[in-house]
Amino acid sequence: MALHDENVVWHPHPVTVTAREQLHGHRGVVLWFTGLSGSGKSTVAGALEEALHHRSVSTYLLDGDNVRHGLCRNLGFSDADRKENIRRVGEVASLMADAGLIVLTAFISPHRAERQLVQERVGHDRFIEIYVDTPLAVCEQRDPKGLYKKARAGELRNFTGIDGIYEAPESPQIHLNGEQLVTNLVSQLLDLLRRRDIISS
């Protein structure tokens, strides 16, 4: 569909975002986890979602591998496809936040420009960038999917951190040390959500 198609008109919803948030008892936001492969994004995001669920918070976790089984199954790993992957996820995350959910996303999302586009789509007041900062050497040592080994052997091209660029966030809302215990990182994130009045104390 062309961006300028005059026959496509936005249909307003009778139920507002505020009304949905009141029903859930908390704000709808997007928590965007970014970092190298093996940094711990999915692990920390999953642990945080579990902690929020136990507090009766409505959540959904969008994981980089999982969306490629459906929503983004037709995309590869070229620069263009990776950009489209993040665009699609950003659109879905924005809709879920409109529904009043706390949306957790775990994607390498190596380029600042793409993360900025998602932030603009979601809204600056509903987007929290979370940088899981783990040294490359530690990520390689973890290598849960064996991808670094393949990249070092030349079997994977344009792999982020090896021969593909990763642009670290310049001013994330929270900067996590990926070598800390997951429980410590979850505590830091819960504190952030309380300070932002996203969840109750």
From Swiss-Prot:
Recorded metabolic or biological pathway in which this protein acts: Sulfur metabolism; hydrogen sulfide biosynthesis; sulfite from sulfate: step 2/3
CDD domains: APSK
Top-level division of the source organism's lineage: Bacteria
Sorted UniProt keywords: ATP-binding, Kinase, Nucleotide-binding, Phosphoprotein, Transferase
Cited InterPro entries: APS_kinase, P-loop_NTPase
Enzyme class: transferase
GO biological process: one example: sulfate assimilation
EC number: 2.7.1.25
GO molecular function: adenylylsulfate kinase activity; ATP binding
Active site per database record: 109 (phosphoserine intermediate)
Binding-site list for ATP: 35-42
A Pfam match: APS_kinase
Catalyzed chemical reaction(s): adenosine 5'-phosphosulfate + ATP = 3'-phosphoadenylyl sulfate + ADP + H(+)
Keyword ATP-binding: yes
Function: Catalyzes the synthesis of activated sulfate.
Family: Belongs to the APS kinase family.
Listed name of the protein: Adenylyl-sulfate kinase
Organism: Salmonella arizonae (strain ATCC BAA-731 / CDC346-86 / RSK2980)
